[in-house]
Amino acid sequence: MSAILRPLVPLGPVVNPQSKRKARLLVVDDDPGLLRLLTIRLRAENYEVEAVESALAALAALARVRPDLVITDLRMDQMDGIGLLKEIQTRAPGLRVIILTAHGTIPDAVQATQSGAFAFLTKPVEKQELLDQVQKALRVSGFADTTEDWR
């Protein structure tokens, strides 16, 4: 008799068990089409999403939105994703940041990681890969009770 092995599948969005509040995500990308796609995908998974088109707009939204996680493009005008990451670390220490890029290089990934990015993903990012990283970042940040992660 052979055993059937089934992969563990995440339940879906992370919800804080104490407040029953959905995780708030701040998504930053200067490509309006991709920003809309990311927003649709994340809202479909029941996350609260604030979408902005620049790092400067993200910094302005940071105090108002009080996100649990930031997802940002690497290459943007005025301030890039690494600059945004460093500014976030100053203003909101401990806030996790996932960096996305269409033109990722090994030096970019090393710089992002050394600067404190939680994850560095290349575009086009697979939906499940993005969702997995979002869930991991939220759990590492202590947003959810990790004992309730799997059914």
Label for each model-derived stretch:
Residues E53-A57, D80-G83:
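Acidic catalytic/metal-coordinating carboxylates
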Residues L35, D77, T105:
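The feature encodes the CheY-like receiver
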Residues V65-I71:
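Active-site beta3 strand of CheY-like receiver
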